[in-house]
From Swiss-Prot:
SUPFAM superfamilies: Homo-oligomeric flavin-containing Cys decarboxylases, HFCD. Keywords: Flavoprotein, FMN, Prenyltransferase, Transferase. The gene is ubiX. InterPro entries: Flavin_trans-like, Flavoprotein, UbiX-like. This is Flavin prenyltransferase UbiX. GO terms for molecular function: carboxy-lyase activity; flavin prenyltransferase activity. Transmembrane segments: none annotated. It comes from Synechocystis sp. (strain ATCC 27184 / PCC 6803 / Kazusa). Its EC number is 2.5.1.129. PANTHER family: FLAVIN PRENYLTRANSFERASE, FLAVIN PRENYLTRANSFERASE PAD1, MITOCHONDRIAL. Dimethylallyl phosphate binds at Y168, R184. It catalyses: dimethylallyl phosphate + FMNH2 = prenylated FMNH2 + phosphate.
Length: 206
């Protein structure tokens, strides 16, 4: 059985990325340990005009409803302030962690080793333990400070997967564009659960 995947949802705009990741992971029967930052609650209100529950079991039902997956896999939600959770420990065994989407505030804190909540602590643990950590920044334009922070993370072994879609798979919907980014993020953990038309070659240079 595959090890659990930690999914961090920060306060960056673009919660649809997290929703689509949950949809595909649960459909493939993965176990997800999810922690949403305090700011992500405000983003749900701003993007969808809905309120995300804070209680873990209710929040798990909320995410399943948003993803349209009633059954399959296992989704465990943690409170953002629960720094004593299992995923806050280096002894917790997992396949890795993806922060999707990842705010520049989260990037900055991780770059200097600061952790003020469970999301940041879990990500910091991945770095110190040498476990896979993927961050998906969704910010533009990027300042020099942003770039330096991302460079620091890359130098520490973190995989940086910007939320930039491709077009060669001829996307027909917003979901197609989002799924490409989700697939590329999960590729970094050798997880292949997103139906995706991958590049087949055939375009010749002039």
């Amino acid at each position: 059985m595959a090890q659990p995947l930690i999914l961090g949802v920060s306060g960056a705009s673009g919660l649809i990325y997290a929703v689509r990741a949950i949809k595909h992971l649960l459909a493939a029967d993965y176990t997800i340990e999810l922690v949403a930052s305090r700011a992500s609650y405000q983003v749900w209100q701003a993007e969808q005009n809905i309120q995300m529950p804070g209680e873990p079991s209710a929040q798990a039902e909320f995410w399943r409803s948003q993803a349209g997956v009633e059954k399959g896999g296992k989704l465990i939600c943690h409170r953002w302030g629960d720094v004593g959770a299992t995923i806050a420990s280096g002894s917790y065994r997992c396949a890795g962690m993806v922060v999707l989407p990842c705010s520049m505030s989260t990037v900055a804190k991780l770059a200097v080793g600061m952790s003020s909540d469970l999301l940041e602590r879990a990500a910091d643990v991945q770095i110190k333990e040498g476990k896979p950590l993927v961050v998906v920044p969704r910010e533009t334009p990027l300042s020099l400070i942003h770039l330096r922070n991302l460079t620091s993370l890359a130098e520490a072994g973190v995989r940086i997967v910007p939320a930039i879609p491709a077009w060669y798979h001829q996307p027909q919907s917003v979901e197609d564009l989002v799924d490409f980014v989700v697939a590329r993020a999960l590729d970094q953990l050798a997880i292949d659960c997103v139906p995706l038309q991958r590049w087949q070659g055939g375009m010749e240079g002039e």
